[in-house]
Amino acid sequence: MSALWLLLGLLALMDLSESSNWGCYGNIQSLDTPGASCGIGRRHGLNYCGVRASERLAEIDMPYLLKYQPMMQTIGQKYCMDPAVIAGVLSRKSPGDKILVNMGDRTSMVQDPGSQAPTSWISESQVSQTTEVLTTRIKEIQRRFPTWTPDQYLRGGLCAYSGGAGYVRSSQDLSCDFCNDVLARAKYLKRHGF
């Protein structure tokens, strides 16, 4: 019986190591990022900025994100996108003290009522659409800049997701606030199980 538990434990470790770095668009764990701008931090009542602010905002959103982690993993596999990046984008789209609520035909921001959190934060089709738009932007960057690295494609795709397809004109445009904040949140979420 103990050999069975040992085998199951080894399989779980192998699965963990395989899923800890996947996605077709760069390795977020190896990316350096300055995190959220001070404007983002101040906008959400924080008196600090950078990675610390991004991590705090992701931490606030984590209880809601965890409910949708299996959905993000499924969608991540479909689009070959790291679920931590998907979670980082969703966290950025629902900053700090606000949460996204599925209102049927639209998504609305509402104040977090604490223990009375909504049962439906965001739908699978909305998460899928968000991920599809991001991967489309990344592929546009790949076509426009074929010599860039996968990490540059991810950064470029995140900046283009936020600023539009024409936002990225050179490698100097890869440090937009949206990208820096999302990557810092994604790295934090990755360390916490995404």
From Swiss-Prot:
Gene symbol of the encoding locus: LYG1
Covalent S-S links between cysteines: C24-C80, C38-C49
SUPFAM superfamilies documented for this protein: Lysozyme-like
UniProt keyword Hydrolase present: yes
Gene Ontology CC: extracellular region
Location relative to the cell: Secreted
Organism whose genome encodes this protein: Homo sapiens
Designated name of the protein: Lysozyme g-like protein 1
Leading EC class: hydrolase
Presence of keyword Membrane: no
Alphabetical UniProt keywords: Disulfide bond, Glycosidase, Hydrolase, Secreted, Signal
Signal peptide: 1-19
Similarity remark: Belongs to the glycosyl hydrolase 23 family.
EC number: 3.2.1.-
Biological process terms in GO annotation: defense response to Gram-positive bacterium; peptidoglycan catabolic process
Recorded GO MF terms: lysozyme activity
Source species, domain of life: Eukaryota
